[in-house]
Regions:
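Glycine- and acidic-residue-rich phosphate-binding/metal-coordinating active-site segment common to enzymes
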Residues: 132-137
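Non-heme Fe(II)-dependent double-stranded beta-helix
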Residues: 1-14, 21-131
């Protein structure tokens, strides 16, 4: 695991973000890419109920349905479970913040040709304070 330094922690608190390079091996990254490509190859009716949540939109190029987002996949796919709950992710975040963290939401956004994209918005929902006071993206 890449240990973050005290200067990394100071940089995070100053800039609001920290880029940690080479956190995962080439093998780990390739496994995640392969699984993501498998998600991308699925058709809307290929997803089971009660597991992952896949969201499709109609392409602006033609009438094809294209995958725009998948959520709730970490607990159903070992490679993503291992990423999300790894010392590399949670351990680094906990070291950075000095407190215990949990996974709140897992999501992959797909930016495909013909996709509508996302209009400017803020990811702010009322009552988030019920769940925690700090939310980080990794």
């Amino acid at each position: 695991m890449n240990k973050i330094s005290e200067s990394d922690i100071a940089e995070f608190h100053e800039k609001g973000f920290l880029l940690v390079k080479n956190c995962f091996s080439e093998l780990e990254i390739n496994q995640a890419i392969k699984k993501t490509q498998e998600f991308e190859a699925r058709l809307p009716n290929d997803w089971g109920r009660g597991n992952e949540m896949a969201y499709y939109e109609t392409s602006q190029n033609n009438s094809e349905r294209i995958l725009m987002r998948i959520e709730n996949y970490v607990d159903y796919h070992q490679i993503f479970h291992d990423f999300a709950y790894s010392e590399k992710i949670l351990g680094t975040i906990e070291h950075l913040m000095g407190e215990h963290f949990v996974l709140f939401k897992d999501k992959i956004n797909f930016k495909k040709s013909g996709g509508g994209g996302y209009r400017p918005h803020q990811d702010k929902t009322t009552k988030w304070s019920q769940y925690g006071t700090i939310f980080l993206n990794a």
